[in-house]
Amino acid sequence: MSVKSLFAGAVGVAVLVMPVIASSASAETSSAAAAKTVCVSTSGAPQFRQYIIAGLGKWNESVRNVQLKECAGATLRYVEGSYGQQGSHAVTNGHGQGTIYIDYQQMAKYDKVRITAHETGHALGLKDHYQGPCSELMSGGGAGTSCHNASPNAQERQSIERMWANGYTAPETWSIQQ
């Protein structure tokens, strides 16, 4: 086999493979482009901003279909204060909109990033599961003060990916019309 034939064959293979590689890269780009961005404001919780940002980071590194960041036109706001028995909580529609209340007393007692990531989970559509182990982010304070896991587990990640697959798909409601 001549060098010329070998070179021509290599170029031919490269020409055939390049569209596949380009197609694969394009699919990754379009998948990433399909991610919904939820804009957040931390201006109401300046004392805890670093923990909120870290909690958002836990979600951003765990899921692809939704990303959270500080930007203009925030639909999700964080505020700090003393909320008594209610403690830290989220008032949200579960679609990336609402207000997350960060409680001073809970932040002094529990893992700060876990609290912010947990409450953000509500804003993304997850419910509490207080009976769950520390490995479940949505077990919240039920896992105790020694729990420092601030990352969603596989089931929580899958739920968010499913819910946010096309932006956020509202829960299906069925009715029978007569």
Regions found by a protein language model. Give the residues of each.
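Active-site recognition of the HExxH zinc-binding catalytic motif
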Residues: 59, 114-128
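Secretory targeting and sorting signals
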Residues: 1-27
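Catalytic zinc-binding patch centered on the HExxH motif and its immediate surroundings
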Residues: 29, 77-101
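Short pre-active-site segment immediately N-terminal to the catalytic Zn-binding motif
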Residues: 100-117
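Acidic/histidine-rich, surface-exposed loop or edge segments in extracytoplasmic proteins
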Residues: 32-44, 95-102, 140-141
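A short alpha-helix/helix-coil micro-patch that ends at or immediately precedes a cysteine
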Residues: 39-68
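Surface-exposed patches in mature extracellular/periplasmic domains of secreted proteins
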Residues: 63-73, 127-133, 171-175
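The catalytic-center signature of Zn2+-dependent metalloproteases
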Residues: 110, 123-169
